[in-house]
């Protein structure tokens, strides 16, 4: 499971999930990616389930990059506890994902295999996602004059 090695504070505010992702909106490492279309918290267990679904479908071929990291702790109070008396104990870790963020990247496999692997991974996540390809930078062929 992904989680920080150590943190300065054990508890954080929930925060707002307004706007679109600032960075990480393009495919950089791989050839294909899975892009978020909604804002949500993605838990470390959901990230791991999506990773396993992708790697099993690809038969351990190709390479997978996980572009999100669960660095935000979420807390929960025990069942049947009255209100008040402080914030609950840390329960797990989440990654804050906003629309436009590339969550996973794949390379080393065909487009059909990558599309199906990322589709299987998207079923493990609580948000709508879409398959994206790497945008090739134009102008390389004309500069060889």
UniProtKB/Swiss-Prot annotation:
PROSITE patterns: RIBOSOMAL_L16_1, RIBOSOMAL_L16_2. GO terms for biological process: translation. One of its GO terms (cellular component) is cytosolic large ribosomal subunit. It comes from the Bacteria. Keywords: Ribonucleoprotein, Ribosomal protein, RNA-binding, rRNA-binding, tRNA-binding. GO terms for molecular function: rRNA binding; structural constituent of ribosome; tRNA binding. Pfam families: Ribosomal_L16. CDD domains: Ribosomal_L16_L10e. InterPro entries: Ribosomal_uL16, Ribosomal_uL16_bact-type, Ribosomal_uL16_CS, Ribosomal_uL16_dom, Ribosomal_uL16_sf. Binds 23S rRNA and is also seen to make contacts with the A and possibly P site tRNAs. Part of the 50S ribosomal subunit. Belongs to the universal ribosomal protein uL16 family. NCBIfam families: rplP_bact. This is Large ribosomal subunit protein uL16. It comes from Shouchella clausii (strain KSM-K16) (Alkalihalobacillus clausii).
